[in-house]
Each structure stands twice: as C-alpha cells, then as structure tokens.
From Swiss-Prot:
Organism: Serratia proteamaculans (strain 568)
Protein name: Fatty acid metabolism regulator protein
Occurrences of domain HTH gntR-type (ranges): 6-74
GO terms under cellular component: cytoplasm
Quaternary state and interactors: Homodimer.
Length: 239
C-alpha cells in the first residue's frame, strides 16, 4: 500500500479507504475498535474520529452510536464525489470508468440541453457565447467545456442536472485536460458549440438531441484513439 498523504488525517483517510477497496476491511464487516485502529494507523483517536465522520458522510462507513462502525458497500451508499478516488485506486479500470462517464454525459446532456434551448434559449445563448473568446489551448478548452455543459444544465430549468455536473467536476476536468490536448478535440468542440448556438437562435430544439448524440459519438471516437497514450497519472490531483 503506497500512501501519498501529507497530513495524519489524510494518511488515515487513505489507509482506511484503500483497506476497504482491497478487502482488508470488506463491505458488511465492522471496523476495528477506535483504540486499536488508531494504533494500527499511527494517529491520535481525535484525528481518527474526525476521519471516520468524514468517511461516513461520503458513504464509505456507517457510524452506529453505541455499536461498532460498519463498512458499507460504497457503490450503493456513496455519491459522485468518490469517482476520483475510485479512479485513483483502480488504474486498470480507468478507461472503462471514463467511457461510462462520457456515456452518462451524452445521455443526460441530450435531455437538459434540449430543455435549455426550448425553455430558456436566451440563457443558453449566453452560456454558448463564451466559446467565441476561448484561447486555443488545452486548459482553456477544458474549463470552457465544463462551464458550457454545467451552464446549460442549469439553464434547463432543472437544477438537479447542474448538481450532477458539480459532482462530476473533479474527474471530468482531469480527463478533459488530456482530451483537449488534441487539436482535433478542440476543433470538434467549437463546431459543436456553434451548432448548438445556431439551434438556439433558430429555436430548433427538436434537433438538439441528435446534435448532442452525434457529438458524443464523434468525441468518443477521438477519445478511443487517445487511450493508447493516456498518461498513468491522469486521475491524480495536480500538486
């Protein structure tokens, strides 16, 4: 187990999460007693208690007052916020995880972008107008792409779509930083934003779903072509 945390709390958190992931503390079992676990990890009980509370909020654990702390099946109890952690823990599954992420984006974006163009075309146009000022480099496009999808999600009138994108931000933008290093990706994105802007102007909301799905297909093809050179630290946080 290689842990890169910089603080005792960070070390304890990574230790427990990796132990759950590697079945040292399997789902459905109980954690060792607080005193034993703090000695095992090498942190104070106060620090451990804070870490356990945080992991419980994220769905990894269930703290039962007066009873031992239970390890959850995190796939059933956690939210989108653990995607980055899962990607870091299981490098071999990262390509499939990202494929699933992009598929989800296309499927829900087809719905909320259509709603934005139909119900709030002026707001959608304002979001898409940002694309006319973007610098032709990876970080700029990465930020723009996230802001456009998130902005259109909120412009749909259903804030739940926006909250979903908030939850996806970490992994989404790390993948995007690599994806938009390809000039073809940036060119395709600009064409997509321009088509959406035209559909907004023409109020042709009935064509939005096909537009989004075609973009998902074309961008997915570019992504597949880039997987062979995907950096091993793609899902690691910048330090």
């Amino acid at each position: 187990m290689v842990i890169k945390a910089q603080s005792p709390a960070g070390f304890a958190e990574e230790y427990i999460i990796e132990s759950i992931w590697n079945n040292r503390f399997p789902p459905g079992t109980i954690l060792p007693a607080e005193r034993e676990l703090s000695e095992l990890i090498g942190v104070t009980r106060t620090t451990l208690r804070e870490v356990l509370q945080r992991l419980a909020r994220d769905g990894w654990l269930t703290i039962q007052h007066g009873k031992p702390t239970k390890v959850n099946n995190f796939w059933e109890t956690s939210g989108l916020n653990i995607l980055e952690t899962v990607a870091r823990l299981d490098h071999q599954s990262v390509p499939q995880l990202i494929d699933n992420l992009l598929s989800v984006r296309t499927n829900i974006a087809a719905i909320f972008i259509r709603a934005a163009v139909r119900n709030h075309p002026e707001a959608a146009q304002e979001v898409l107008a940002k694309a006319t000022q973007v610098e032709d480099q990876a970080d700029a496009f990465n930020l723009l792409d996230y802001e456009i999808f998130r902005g259109l999600a909120f412009a749909s009138g259903n804030p739940i779509y926006g909250l979903i994108f908030n939850g996806l931000k970490g992994l989404y933008t790390r993948v995007g930083r690599y994806y938009f290093s390809n000039p073809e990706s940036r060119k395709l994105a600009l064409t997509f934003y321009s088509k959406l802007s035209t559909l907004c102007h023409e109020k042709s909301y009935d064509q939005v779903m096909d537009c989004v799905r075609n973009y998902g297909k074309d961008s997915g093809a570019i992504w597949q072509s880039m997987q062979g050179t995907m950096p091993s630290d793609l899902t690691e946080a910048r330090r």
